[in-house]
């Protein structure tokens, strides 16, 4: 195992996101890792809900014959399986496959339930574990067992399905850039790289610091290919001249725990991982310089102001410095450090994970304007409580109500001030870690117009992506591994268009597109 991967594993283990499983390519999700994945689920579920997508759960074990049937109809669809062939001493008449993907299950279900055009669209998503045979495994990047979500939809028309494919692709771009703070390479998959059976596949990828690409999400338009193969039909409102049922048009789209690998590879420093705020298990870490009743009370009051955030007190170790290191290794985006000085001056000290040396001080002392408002509020409150004491409350009861009301208003002042500063720092934090990712990506994309230049850069060990004029011809693409071993077309750019008469650098045919060529996990 090389040093770079050792460092990567160390970051994952020290952050509490990962622990190696007992079998090759498996892993244990410690609390931090699972919470991060659940935060990703929550973000995406909110996006899916906008379209009326509903979550479902399908079986893990799939009859082997389902895949044999699909292989006959879908050229190139032949995933390698984990199979269950025996239960106890009894050999099975038909092997059961541990789910590598769920197309066959969804379409078998659709075949049995869809009847009329009035039931369309079908919009479903599944969060589950899948199993793949991998020779070279890397935590979160290539696993034999991992977590993902896969969405499957059916539509009455091709246009509806194509539009839905595009929408989900855009949602993934938004999620990766804004929630994971990763700069992306997005485009359409080439003929050789698109999903088997798909008419079109769209991808969201990121360029990692080692110069390799990682596919984070895909969205596929299948036309009616899978529905024909699996005999999924519906009765249309407009029957054709023979009155035959119609095949719906389908899509599939998904992302996985690879996202965690991308975060760990991209957002880190010598202290460990740096987690994006949206997905971090703990968004704000509290550290006390010493533990005494005064500081604990001050911490509790400060935490109460921030109940909209995921906060946690880091006090595993006796020394504050060790607790600060612990919070940094776990990648907490923000730290609030409380000591004697903070208590006496009525301030809190804030530190950002991306710039640990910089300290931000927030005062909890009321301004003169706030003090005047509170005095007037208190005077009016006393007068009104006595005037409108319809329930004949005692003096003690009125005093308690009065104190609660004043405390509530004062807490609101303090909360507004603290949250305003924290939101500003969150925005800067997210912007900063995204920009570092974008800067690396932009510096490592190289425009290359001829094969000799490409070959020279590859032989020199230049790491990154090469933007090349490309014909998108399947026969041409299949010879790329012979010319440039370990490289593949990552996607076709939808923003960079090739010049008229520009030629493909591999076969000299006219280029249709610019394509991103690179190595990948």
Residue ranges and their predicted role:
Residues 1-521:
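NTP/phosphate- and nucleic-acid-binding module
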């Amino acid at each position: 195992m090389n040093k770079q991967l050792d460092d990567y594993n160390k970051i994952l283990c020290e952050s509490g996101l990962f622990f190696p499983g007992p079998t090759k390519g498996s892993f244990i999700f410690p609390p931090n890792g699972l919470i991060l994945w659940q935060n990703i689920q929550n973000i995406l579920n909110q996006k899916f809900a906008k379209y009326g997508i509903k979550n479902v759960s399908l079986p893990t074990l799939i009859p082997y014959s389902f895949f044999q049937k699909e292989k006959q109809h879908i050229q190139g669809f032949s995933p390698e399986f984990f199979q269950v062939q025996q239960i106890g001493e009894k050999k099975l008449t038909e092997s059961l496959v541990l789910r590598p993907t769920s197309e066959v299950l969804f379409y078998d279900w659709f075949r049995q339930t869809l009847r009329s055009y009035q039931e369309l669209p079908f919009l479903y998503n599944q969060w589950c574990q899948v199993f793949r045979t991998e020779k070279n495994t890397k935590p979160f990047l290539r696993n034999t067992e991992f977590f993902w979500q896969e969405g499957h939809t059916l539509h009455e028309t091709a246009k509806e399905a194509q539009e839905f494919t595009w929408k989900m692709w855009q949602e993934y771009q938004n999620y990766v850039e804004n929630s994971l703070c990763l700069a992306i390479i997005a485009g359409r998959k080439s003929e050789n790289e698109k999903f088997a059976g798909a008419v079109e596949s769209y991808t969201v990828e990121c360029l990692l610091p080692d110069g390799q690409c990682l596919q984070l999400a895909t969205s596929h338009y299948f036309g009616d290919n899978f529905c024909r193969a699996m005999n999924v039909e519906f009765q249309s409102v407009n029957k054709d001249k023979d009155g035959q049922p119609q095949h719906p048009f389908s899509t599939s789209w998904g992302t996985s725990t690879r996202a965690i690998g991308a975060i760990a590879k991209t957002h880190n420093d010598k202290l460990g991982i740096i987690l994006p705020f949206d997905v971090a298990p703990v968004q704000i870490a509290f550290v006390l310089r010493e533990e005494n009743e005064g500081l604990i009370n001050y911490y509790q009051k400060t935490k109460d102001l921030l109940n909209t955030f995921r906060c946690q007190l880091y006090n595993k170790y006796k020394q504050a410095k060790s607790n600060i290191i612990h919070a940094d290794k776990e990648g907490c985006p923000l730290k609030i450090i409380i000591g004697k000085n903070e208590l006496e001056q009525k301030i809190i000290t804030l530190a950002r994970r991306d710039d640990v040396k910089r300290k931000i001080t927030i005062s909890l002392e009321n301004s003169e304007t706030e003090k005047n408002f509170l005095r007037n509020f208190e005077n009016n409150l006393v007068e009104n409580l006595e005037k409108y004491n319809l329930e004949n409350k005692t003096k003690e009861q009125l005093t308690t109500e009065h104190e609660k009301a004043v405390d509530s208003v004062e807490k609101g002042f303090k909360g507004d001030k603290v949250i305003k500063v924290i939101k500003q720092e969150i925005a800067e934090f997210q912007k900063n870690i995204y920009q570092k990712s974008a800067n690396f990506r932009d510096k490592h994309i190289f425009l290359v117009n001829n094969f000799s230049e490409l070959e020279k850069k590859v032989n020199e060990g230049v790491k990154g992506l090469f933007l090349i004029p490309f014909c998108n011809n399947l026969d041409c693409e299949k010879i790329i591994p012979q010319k440039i071993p370990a490289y593949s077309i990552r996607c076709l750019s939808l923003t960079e268009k090739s010049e008229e008469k520009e030629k493909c650098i591999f076969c000299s045919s006219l280029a249709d597109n610019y394509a991103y060529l690179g190595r990948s996990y």
